[in-house]
């Protein structure tokens, strides 16, 4: 190792030590994603699923961490490219990497701003904990054109059953029936057992 290399190593170590928030955010993103997906898988094989509050909360945190990591990655690589203590080839590669990640970062932001509200408007289903035929259940409303309500077994504030137990059609309207003073009449309904087999239907 020559003197030049010996000078480079402390400079690189010092440079990396100033980016601890990048490391924290990156590790948080990896750990949170792995824990969430693993827990989701374990729930799924046991006939359970996360409720909306958990899904949206974790999704929002992961999105924020992705944005932070992309921004910090681009900044980190840019600083590598500007570091004259590094070899020219590494600086060039870092500069290219910074440019690519910056474009990805910008694309994610633009797509989020333009299509994010539209995606949320179509994907969001109001959730209600209700008493249905003497049983506590979690109801989800899909009311884009016609009004559909899916009922799942209630487990706790964070988890529900993954199998639809009752699905109802309340006709056209585009409204949330649980926000009405009086629940509208059900046009048709299908009941399922825990295995997803139809046990009765009407309408």
Residue ranges and their predicted role:
Residues 1-20:
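Membrane-anchoring hydrophobic segments
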Residues 87-120:
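Internal/C-terminal transmembrane anchor helices
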Residues 24-83:
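Membrane-embedded alpha-helical segments of integral membrane proteins
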Residues 132-135, 140-203:
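Extracytosolic and intramembrane catalytic regions of membrane-associated proteins
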Residues 70-81, 111-112, 117, 145-163:
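Juxtamembrane/interfacial segments around transmembrane helices
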Residues 8-9, 15, 123, 201-203:
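Short, surface-exposed polybasic-aromatic patches that bind anionic ligands, especially phosphate groups
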Residues 114-137:
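Alpha-helical transmembrane signal-anchor/signal-peptide segments
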Residues 14-17, 79-93:
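Membrane-interface helix-boundary motifs at transmembrane edges
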């Amino acid at each position: 190792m020559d003197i030049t290399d010996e000078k480079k190593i402390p400079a690189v170590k010092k440079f990396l030590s100033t980016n601890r928030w990048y490391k924290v955010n990156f590790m948080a993103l990896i750990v949170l994603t792995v824990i969430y997906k693993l827990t989701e898988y374990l729930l799924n094989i046991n006939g359970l699923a996360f409720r909306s509050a958990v899904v949206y909360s974790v999704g929002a945190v992961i999105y924020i961490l992705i944005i932070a990591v992309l921004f910090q990655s681009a900044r980190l690589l840019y600083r590598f490219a500007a570091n004259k203590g590094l070899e020219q080839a590494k600086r060039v590669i870092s500069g290219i990497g910074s440019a690519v990640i910056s474009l990805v970062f910008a694309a994610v932001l633009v797509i989020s701003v333009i299509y994010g509200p539209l995606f949320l408007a179509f994907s969001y289903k109001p959730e209600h904990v209700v008493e249905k035929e003497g049983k506590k259940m979690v109801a989800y409303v899909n009311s884009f054109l016609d009004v559909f309500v899916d009922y799942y077994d209630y487990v706790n504030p964070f988890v529900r059953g993954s199998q639809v137990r009752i699905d109802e059609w309340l006709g056209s309207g585009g409204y949330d029936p649980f926000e009405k003073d009086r629940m509208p009449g059900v046009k048709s309904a299908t009941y399922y057992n825990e295995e997803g087999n139809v046990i009765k239907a009407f309408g």
